[in-house]
Amino acid sequence: MSDVIALAKDLIRRPSVTPLDEGCQTLMAERLAKLGFVIEPMVFEDTTNLWARRGSEGPLFCFAGHTDVVPAGPLDKWHTPPFEPTIQDGVLYGRGAADMKGSLAAMVVAVERFVAEHPDHSGSIAFLITSDEEGPFINGTTRVIDTLEARHEKITWCIVGEPSSTTVVGDVVKNGRRGSITGDLLVRGVQGHVAYPHLADNPIHKAAPALAELAATVWDEGNAYFPPTSFQIANISAGTGASNVIPGELHVQFNFRFSTELTDLDIRERVEALLDRHGLDYQLDWTLSGQPFLTDTGKLLAAAVSAIEAVNGQQPALLTTGGTSDGRFIAPTGAEVIELGPVNATIHKVNECVKADDLDLLADMYQGVLARLLA
């Protein structure tokens, strides 16, 4: 069994469902301390974070990731217990195998091998690890970044170990992500009897044309790096459950995944102008989860593409599709940020798994990036 697989299994054994860490970061920190990393736990409320750094000079290369995992779901649907890592036919099963304890293991082993070969490497290497990525993301990476910013500690390059690959490890590098903003809309009407609509004011009827227009609007055309901005209604509710009562309120929750063609302010202004134009009596609360970011050029992207080609002979596709990641908190500092990790076909599913050999290849890729930037 390789060092990468052994560490991945040790991490998977710890049932670190958000926001729990269950000792995963301690396990990583013990190995990093032996390499000369300065270990700095950062605990905020219920979240465990780790900042570990080797070196004091720039440029600063950072591996970022999370030790928390989503709940296992129905245990009877798993071939093997989710927190008892098992290898069957060359495939490693367990919650977090792909998202993202396999990546964490590959990162640690890659650094161990790199430092052994280049003990006097240039610059610095760091790990930014949280137990709050799968949850509310309030006390995790964003708080660590705030701490680093306050003391003027700047990340130059960052690889987030999210499972970016689709078929073969390294076939996709995420060099950016769309922004995400959610609207919670309350439309007010007047409750009444369905037989006396003139004595009531149905908020569903009033809001329906506005919602239809929101859904039909082309918000932008996208660009060379991002698909067009998308609008989706996620939840809608109204009424008492009785068939003879006109509801007094309508609640709608919707989300935008937006490109760099728009800002969150653009979206807010356009949505509110549309609702005003339809004459609605409403309250709208916004939650911005993250701004879009893009690393279209730079040394990190070039090093990653070269390292991947050296390992699997394939040039990766550069994509910005998918959900958000903690890269959205790191990119605004000015760092070059990409995501590179294992195949994502089974993430958040029962029987989450990854090819064991893929994690060894991933470690080789990570080590190759370090060699191209800091050797």
Swiss-Prot record:
Catalysed reaction, written as an equation: N-succinyl-(2S,6S)-2,6-diaminopimelate + H2O = (2S,6S)-2,6-diaminopimelate + succinate
Residues the entry annotates as binding Zn(2+) 2: D99, E134, H348
Record's keyword annotation contains Metal-binding: yes
This protein's UniProt keywords: Amino-acid biosynthesis, Cobalt, Diaminopimelate biosynthesis, Hydrolase, Lysine biosynthesis, Metal-binding, Zinc
Pathway(s) where this gene product acts: Amino-acid biosynthesis; L-lysine biosynthesis via DAP pathway; LL-2,6-diaminopimelate from (S)-tetrahydrodipicolinate (succinylase route): step 3/3
UniProt-listed InterPro entries: ArgE/DapE_CS, Bact_exopeptidase_dim_dom, DapE_proteobac, Peptidase_M20, Peptidase_M20_dimer, Peptidase_M20A
Annotated binding of Zn(2+) 1, by residue: H66, D99, E162
Cofactor dependency: Zn(2+); Co(2+)
Keyword Metal-binding in annotation: yes
Cofactor note: Binds 2 Zn(2+) or Co(2+) ions per subunit.
Active site: D68, E133
Biological process annotations from GO: diaminopimelate biosynthetic process; L-arginine biosynthetic process; lysine biosynthetic process via diaminopimelate
EC identifiers of the protein: 3.5.1.18
Enzyme type, top EC level: hydrolase
NCBIfam families: dapE_proteo, PRK13009.1
Family according to the record: Belongs to the peptidase M20A family. DapE subfamily.
HAMAP family: DapE (MF_01690)
Known function: Catalyzes the hydrolysis of N-succinyl-L,L-diaminopimelic acid (SDAP), forming succinate and LL-2,6-diaminopimelate (DAP), an intermediate involved in the bacterial biosynthesis of lysine and meso-diaminopimelic acid, an essential component of bacterial cell walls.
Assembly notes: Homodimer.
Record protein name field: Succinyl-diaminopimelate desuccinylase
